[in-house]
A protein has these predicted regions:
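Nucleotidyltransferase catalytic core that binds NTPs
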Residues: 1-108
Length: 108
């Protein structure tokens, strides 16, 4: 990757629970966009839904189990670090910390 930026996709969500649909869209994005990695950015709670069904730690654990065979998918949690649940703040944070990375927001 000399002279080129690392390509990382961002798929945000509550993953409550993580499921095959999340995995499928992730694999498609990795292949179609030639991503080096894809981050599943788990949020504490979906602001548009009521209560969560599973705890944050359970959702992170289930996400890791579901994606274990796809080495390019990484499970991340940033809300406490960036003090925000908003995607725009996450993208600002990641861009500031990773100057040599091109981020792709995956929406599905």
């Amino acid at each position: 990757m000399i002279g080129s930026k690392k390509k990382i996709g961002i798929l945000g969500g509550s993953f409550d629970p993580p499921h095959q649909g999340h995995l499928k869209i992730s694999k498609i994005a990795i292949n179609k966009l030639s991503l080096d990695e894809l981050y599943w950015c788990v949020t504490k709670k979906n602001p548009f839904k009521g209560k969560t069904f599973f705890s944050l730690s359970s959702r992170i654990k289930k996400s890791k189990l579901l994606t274990a065979k796809v080495k390019k998918i990484k499970i991340k949690f940033y809300e406490d670090k960036i003090k925000s649940k908003y995607t725009v703040e996450l993208i600002k944070y990641l861009n500031k910390k990773n100057k040599k990375t091109q981020f792709y927001l995956i929406i599905g």
